[in-house]
Regions:
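Residue-level recognition of alpha-helical structural elements
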Residues: 1, 154-157, 177
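N-terminal amphipathic/basic leader segments beginning at the initiator methionine
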Residues: 1-17
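Secondary-structure boundary/capping signal
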Residues: 20, 53-57, 213
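Glycine-rich phosphate-binding loops that contact phosphosugars or nucleotide phosphates
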Residues: 25-166, 170, 206
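An accessory alpha-helical subdomain
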Residues: 191-202
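Single conserved hydrophobic/aromatic residue that forms the stacking wall/gate
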Residues: 206-215
Length: 215
Protein backbone atom coordinates (compact mmCIF):
# COMPACT_ATOMS: atom_id res chain seq x y z
CA UNK A 1 0.00 0.00 0.00
CA UNK A 2 2.87 2.36 0.81
CA UNK A 3 4.16 2.37 -2.76
CA UNK A 4 0.69 3.36 -4.01
CA UNK A 5 0.51 6.24 -1.53
CA UNK A 6 3.88 7.48 -2.76
CA UNK A 7 2.62 7.12 -6.35
CA UNK A 8 -0.37 9.43 -5.79
CA UNK A 9 1.22 12.26 -7.76
CA UNK A 10 1.69 10.05 -10.81
CA UNK A 11 -1.89 8.79 -10.51
CA UNK A 12 -3.21 12.36 -10.60
CA UNK A 13 -1.18 13.04 -13.76
CA UNK A 14 -2.25 9.84 -15.56
CA UNK A 15 -4.10 10.28 -18.85
CA UNK A 16 -7.12 7.99 -18.73
CA UNK A 17 -8.91 6.13 -21.51
CA UNK A 18 -12.43 7.28 -22.34
CA UNK A 19 -15.12 6.00 -24.66
CA UNK A 20 -15.05 7.16 -28.27
CA UNK A 21 -16.46 10.68 -28.67
CA UNK A 22 -16.73 11.00 -24.88
CA UNK A 23 -19.19 13.81 -24.09
CA UNK A 24 -21.11 14.53 -20.90
CA UNK A 25 -24.19 16.64 -21.60
CA UNK A 26 -25.17 19.35 -19.14
CA UNK A 27 -27.31 18.29 -16.18
CA UNK A 28 -29.00 19.75 -13.10
CA UNK A 29 -29.44 16.57 -11.05
CA UNK A 30 -26.73 13.93 -10.59
CA UNK A 31 -26.93 10.55 -8.85
CA UNK A 32 -23.57 8.95 -8.07
CA UNK A 33 -23.48 5.30 -7.00
CA UNK A 34 -20.29 3.78 -5.61
CA UNK A 35 -19.23 1.67 -2.64
CA UNK A 36 -16.17 1.75 -0.39
CA UNK A 37 -12.97 3.11 -1.87
CA UNK A 38 -14.69 3.63 -5.22
CA UNK A 39 -17.45 5.66 -3.59
CA UNK A 40 -14.92 8.11 -2.13
CA UNK A 41 -14.38 9.46 -5.66
CA UNK A 42 -18.08 10.23 -5.75
CA UNK A 43 -17.72 12.23 -2.54
CA UNK A 44 -14.91 14.21 -4.16
CA UNK A 45 -17.04 15.01 -7.22
CA UNK A 46 -19.97 16.05 -5.02
CA UNK A 47 -17.66 18.40 -3.10
CA UNK A 48 -16.41 20.03 -6.32
CA UNK A 49 -19.90 20.42 -7.78
CA UNK A 50 -21.35 21.77 -4.52
CA UNK A 51 -18.61 24.40 -4.37
CA UNK A 52 -18.78 25.47 -8.02
CA UNK A 53 -22.34 24.85 -9.30
CA UNK A 54 -26.02 24.75 -8.32
CA UNK A 55 -26.32 21.11 -9.41
CA UNK A 56 -28.19 18.77 -7.06
CA UNK A 57 -25.82 15.88 -6.26
CA UNK A 58 -26.69 12.70 -4.37
CA UNK A 59 -24.10 10.03 -3.52
CA UNK A 60 -25.70 6.63 -2.95
CA UNK A 61 -23.83 3.74 -1.31
CA UNK A 62 -26.38 0.95 -1.43
CA UNK A 63 -28.14 -1.46 -3.78
CA UNK A 64 -30.14 -0.21 -6.75
CA UNK A 65 -31.99 3.04 -7.42
CA UNK A 66 -35.17 3.70 -5.40
CA UNK A 67 -38.25 4.58 -7.44
CA UNK A 68 -38.52 8.01 -5.82
CA UNK A 69 -35.00 8.78 -7.08
CA UNK A 70 -35.55 7.29 -10.55
CA UNK A 71 -38.71 9.39 -10.91
CA UNK A 72 -36.52 12.53 -10.70
CA UNK A 73 -34.80 11.41 -13.92
CA UNK A 74 -31.26 12.25 -12.69
CA UNK A 75 -28.14 11.78 -14.74
CA UNK A 76 -26.39 8.76 -13.21
CA UNK A 77 -22.70 8.05 -12.69
CA UNK A 78 -21.75 4.55 -11.55
CA UNK A 79 -18.31 4.05 -10.02
CA UNK A 80 -16.74 0.66 -9.30
CA UNK A 81 -13.02 0.08 -9.58
CA UNK A 82 -13.43 -3.64 -10.28
CA UNK A 83 -16.60 -3.16 -12.29
CA UNK A 84 -18.24 -6.06 -10.47
CA UNK A 85 -19.54 -4.51 -7.24
CA UNK A 86 -23.00 -6.05 -6.68
CA UNK A 87 -24.68 -2.92 -5.38
CA UNK A 88 -23.41 -0.79 -8.25
CA UNK A 89 -24.20 -3.35 -10.96
CA UNK A 90 -27.77 -3.59 -9.65
CA UNK A 91 -28.04 0.20 -9.81
CA UNK A 92 -26.88 0.17 -13.45
CA UNK A 93 -29.56 -2.38 -14.30
CA UNK A 94 -32.15 -0.16 -12.60
CA UNK A 95 -30.96 2.79 -14.69
CA UNK A 96 -31.33 0.71 -17.85
CA UNK A 97 -34.81 -0.45 -16.80
CA UNK A 98 -35.89 3.14 -16.12
CA UNK A 99 -34.27 4.48 -19.30
CA UNK A 100 -32.07 6.93 -17.38
CA UNK A 101 -29.02 8.74 -18.76
CA UNK A 102 -25.94 7.02 -17.29
CA UNK A 103 -22.20 6.50 -17.57
CA UNK A 104 -19.50 4.60 -15.67
CA UNK A 105 -16.00 4.76 -14.23
CA UNK A 106 -14.27 1.39 -13.91
CA UNK A 107 -11.19 -0.66 -14.73
CA UNK A 108 -13.30 -3.35 -16.41
CA UNK A 109 -15.79 -6.00 -15.31
CA UNK A 110 -19.55 -5.91 -15.77
CA UNK A 111 -19.83 -2.13 -15.60
CA UNK A 112 -17.54 -1.58 -18.56
CA UNK A 113 -19.22 -4.40 -20.49
CA UNK A 114 -22.65 -2.85 -19.91
CA UNK A 115 -21.41 0.60 -20.91
CA UNK A 116 -20.03 -0.73 -24.19
CA UNK A 117 -23.11 -2.87 -24.84
CA UNK A 118 -25.44 0.11 -24.37
CA UNK A 119 -23.03 2.61 -25.97
CA UNK A 120 -22.78 4.72 -22.83
CA UNK A 121 -19.88 7.08 -21.95
CA UNK A 122 -17.16 5.65 -19.73
CA UNK A 123 -13.79 6.45 -18.22
CA UNK A 124 -11.49 3.45 -17.86
CA UNK A 125 -8.83 3.41 -15.14
CA UNK A 126 -5.84 1.02 -15.09
CA UNK A 127 -6.57 -2.32 -13.34
CA UNK A 128 -4.58 -4.24 -10.74
CA UNK A 129 -5.00 -2.11 -7.59
CA UNK A 130 -7.17 -2.13 -4.50
CA UNK A 131 -9.85 0.59 -4.82
CA UNK A 132 -8.39 2.66 -1.96
CA UNK A 133 -4.96 2.44 -3.57
CA UNK A 134 -6.41 3.94 -6.76
CA UNK A 135 -7.63 7.17 -5.13
CA UNK A 136 -5.62 9.41 -7.46
CA UNK A 137 -6.83 7.60 -10.57
CA UNK A 138 -10.47 7.70 -9.47
CA UNK A 139 -10.21 11.38 -8.55
CA UNK A 140 -8.81 12.15 -12.00
CA UNK A 141 -11.61 10.09 -13.56
CA UNK A 142 -14.49 11.94 -11.88
CA UNK A 143 -13.11 15.30 -13.03
CA UNK A 144 -14.28 14.35 -16.53
CA UNK A 145 -17.80 14.85 -15.18
CA UNK A 146 -17.51 18.36 -13.73
CA UNK A 147 -19.09 19.89 -16.85
CA UNK A 148 -18.47 19.97 -20.57
CA UNK A 149 -16.86 23.41 -20.41
CA UNK A 150 -14.97 22.99 -17.12
CA UNK A 151 -13.64 19.42 -17.23
CA UNK A 152 -10.40 20.46 -18.94
CA UNK A 153 -9.77 23.05 -16.23
CA UNK A 154 -10.20 20.52 -13.43
CA UNK A 155 -8.23 17.82 -15.21
CA UNK A 156 -5.36 20.30 -15.48
CA UNK A 157 -5.70 21.03 -11.75
CA UNK A 158 -5.18 17.31 -11.12
CA UNK A 159 -2.06 17.39 -13.30
CA UNK A 160 -0.70 20.39 -11.40
CA UNK A 161 -1.48 18.78 -8.04
CA UNK A 162 0.38 15.66 -9.16
CA UNK A 163 3.39 17.71 -10.21
CA UNK A 164 3.43 19.54 -6.87
CA UNK A 165 3.09 16.33 -4.87
CA UNK A 166 5.93 14.68 -6.76
CA UNK A 167 8.08 17.75 -6.17
CA UNK A 168 7.38 17.65 -2.42
CA UNK A 169 8.12 13.93 -2.22
CA UNK A 170 11.34 14.31 -4.20
CA UNK A 171 12.75 16.56 -1.48
CA UNK A 172 12.84 13.65 0.98
CA UNK A 173 13.91 10.04 0.65
CA UNK A 174 11.35 7.26 0.96
CA UNK A 175 13.00 6.09 4.19
CA UNK A 176 12.67 9.57 5.71
CA UNK A 177 8.98 9.76 4.79
CA UNK A 178 8.28 6.29 6.19
CA UNK A 179 10.13 7.11 9.42
CA UNK A 180 8.04 10.26 9.90
CA UNK A 181 4.82 8.35 9.22
CA UNK A 182 5.78 5.55 11.62
CA UNK A 183 6.67 7.95 14.42
CA UNK A 184 3.40 9.85 13.97
CA UNK A 185 1.34 6.64 13.93
CA UNK A 186 2.97 5.51 17.19
CA UNK A 187 2.18 8.85 18.83
CA UNK A 188 -1.53 8.78 17.94
CA UNK A 189 -2.23 5.03 18.16
CA UNK A 190 -3.20 5.19 21.86
CA UNK A 191 -4.98 8.54 21.69
CA UNK A 192 -8.32 9.84 20.43
CA UNK A 193 -7.53 12.09 17.49
CA UNK A 194 -9.32 15.36 16.78
CA UNK A 195 -9.28 16.14 13.06
CA UNK A 196 -10.28 19.44 11.50
CA UNK A 197 -10.89 19.46 7.76
CA UNK A 198 -12.33 21.72 5.11
CA UNK A 199 -15.02 19.17 4.22
CA UNK A 200 -16.61 16.13 5.91
CA UNK A 201 -15.18 13.70 3.35
CA UNK A 202 -11.65 14.99 3.95
CA UNK A 203 -12.13 14.76 7.70
CA UNK A 204 -13.56 11.27 8.10
CA UNK A 205 -12.33 9.29 5.10
CA UNK A 206 -10.18 6.24 5.94
CA UNK A 207 -10.44 6.64 9.73
CA UNK A 208 -9.85 3.33 11.54
CA UNK A 209 -9.53 4.53 15.16
CA UNK A 210 -12.03 6.35 17.43
CA UNK A 211 -11.82 9.92 16.20
CA UNK A 212 -13.58 13.26 16.58
CA UNK A 213 -13.80 15.23 13.36
CA UNK A 214 -15.07 18.71 12.61
CA UNK A 215 -15.38 20.99 9.57
Amino acid sequence: MIEHVLDLGNQLKKELETSTDFVIDSYNDLLIVGMGGSGVAGDVLKLVLNETTQINVEVRKAYGIPKVVADRRPKCLFISYSGNTEETVEAVNDAIKNNLDWSVISSGGQLLELAKEHERPFVKVPPGLQPRAAFGLMTKAVMHYVSSDKDGEYLEMCNQAGEYLNEVLSNQSENELLAQALNLSKEISTKTSVIYGGTPSVSYTHLTLPTIYSV
